Regions:
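Nucleotide/pyrophosphate-binding catalytic subdomain
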Residues: 1-214, 221-223, 227, 235-245
Length: 245
């Protein structure tokens, strides 16, 4: 809300992995992941849709609206916001983004609302797909020509050694991250986040940030201080290098 009040146009994109897993467990269904992506059969995609649109999205909207009635919840299905196709038959109904309809988002932004987007997309037949929230966020940032792509997670940022807080990477480039993935330093569920972020900064988004969403005022500390508090990712080269803002 503060970002909106100071003239920014924030867009919130969310998943709901832990909540989906919890409901699947209650239903006696096992979760399976491949390279950080949830294998999604027909039943699982319906569970994902129910959790994202029926639980997580309205909770986030309500939390924002405590501070003013600014947030509006939508899903990628609404207005053809996120068009998708199957990524890999072995993953089932896991979608790759094929197209973003920015008019849906820009319409809300122009009316001074904060869009809160659940990452369920659909193809032209109406088939729903579970889309990794990091992947969707990157595609949306590119489509909007966003200045920043910010990931709030449960780690302080990227580390060269996950067990050593002193190895936190404060600033890096897309090429350097490619090398860290190739060397196996970045793995698992972090891969979709890094892939989408590097793609975004190579396609017009000026900076990506990986932050610990559990830290109070983390966005202000990252964006409005020279050193920041997490990891900042930019395109290769020094022409974009500067202070955090």
């Amino acid at each position: 809300v503060l970002m909106r009040l100071v003239g920014m146009r924030p867009v919130v994109v969310h998943g709901g992995g832990p909540q989906i897993t919890a409901l699947m467990e209650r239903l006696g269904k096992k979760s399976e992941f491949v390279n950080g992506l949830r294998v999604t059969d027909a039943e699982t995609v319906e569970i994902a849709r129910m959790v994202l649109k029926g639980e997580v999205n309205p909770q986030l909207v309500a939390a924002i609206n405590v501070h003013g009635n600014y947030a509006v919840g939508v899903s990628g299905v609404d207005g053809g916001l996120i068009r998708a196709e199957a990524r890999d038959p072995e993953l089932g109904f896991v979608g790759d983004v094929t197209e973003i309809n920015p008019e849906v988002i820009n319409g809300l932004l122009d009316d001074e609302f904060i869009p809160v987007i659940a990452t369920i997309g659909s193809d032209e037949t109406g088939q729903a797909y579970n889309i990794n929230a990091d992947t969707a966020a990157g595609a949306i940032a590119e489509a909007l020509g966003a200045e920043k792509l910010i990931y709030l997670t449960d780690i302080e940022g990227l580390r060269r050694d996950v067990a050593d807080a002193a190895t936190l990477i404060r600033r890096t480039t897309a090429d350097e991250l490619d090398a860290l993935v190739a060397d196996g330093i970045i793995a698992g569920g972090m891969i979709p986040k890094i892939d989408s972020c590097t793609h975004a900064v190579r396609n017009g988004v000026k900076g990506g940030h990986i932050l610990d969403g559990r830290v109070a005022h983390v966005l202000l500390l990252e964006l409005f201080t020279d050193d920041g508090i997490g990891t900042m990712i930019e395109n290769t080269g020094t022409e974009q290098m500067g202070t955090r803002p």
